[in-house]
């Protein structure tokens, strides 16, 4: 739904499409908020997502029909980079206002990122509500659900360290909502 996709851009024929996986390398340590972001992006691009752990590092794997998994992976990378850039801008702004180095305070980054993800999720939901024909187009296909069930994944709880400051989450929310609506996000803006 993001990036102004139209119903004509999505293939709705009944022939069974091949389910594919696209891995996105995350390095050795995965911030918990990235797992949440991956799930939100995957749902918006007709995909499922899971995290894979190995000795070489961690990956998030997007599972979708056709090119859906590749598109979801690219969108995830762009969203994660935008979130990091916006958070850095937020930290610079808070330091200029005399709040010190907020990036080192416990829970601030997790809270801000959860706000960003909530804003992004709302922007995606608004795009669907503005064009109700898209609601059916972004439903995760049954073949993807069967593939995800067949993998035999263990579920774990995502635990993001947060702070109780509502202003931190609100700032992240506004940045995520703006990014989801297509506003240009750079390291200098936000």
Which ranges hold each PLM region?
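Extended, helix-rich structural scaffolds rather than catalytic motifs
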Residues: 4-190
């Amino acid at each position: 739904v993001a990036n102004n996709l139209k119903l004509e851009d999505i293939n709705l024929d009944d022939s069974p499409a091949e389910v594919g996986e696209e891995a996105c390398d995350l390095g050795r340590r995965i911030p918990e908020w990235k797992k949440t972001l991956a799930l939100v992006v995957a749902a918006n691009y007709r995909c499922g997502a899971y995290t894979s752990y190995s000795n070489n590092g961690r990956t998030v794997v997007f599972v979708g029909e056709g090119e859906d998994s590749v598109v979801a992976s690219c969108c995830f990378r762009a969203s994660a980079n935008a979130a990091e850039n916006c958070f850095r801008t937020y930290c610079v702004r808070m330091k200029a206002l005399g709040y010190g180095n907020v990036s080192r305070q416990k829970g601030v980054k997790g809270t801000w990122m959860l706000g960003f993800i909530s804003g992004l999720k709302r922007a995606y939901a608004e795009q669907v509500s503005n064009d109700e024909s898209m609601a059916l187009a972004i439903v995760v296909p049954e073949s993807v659900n069967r593939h995800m069930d067949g993998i035999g994944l263990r579920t774990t709880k995502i635990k993001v360290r947060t702070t109780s400051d509502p202003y931190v989450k609100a700032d992240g929310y506004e940045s995520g909502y703006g990014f989801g609506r297509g506003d240009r996000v750079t390291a200098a803006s936000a």
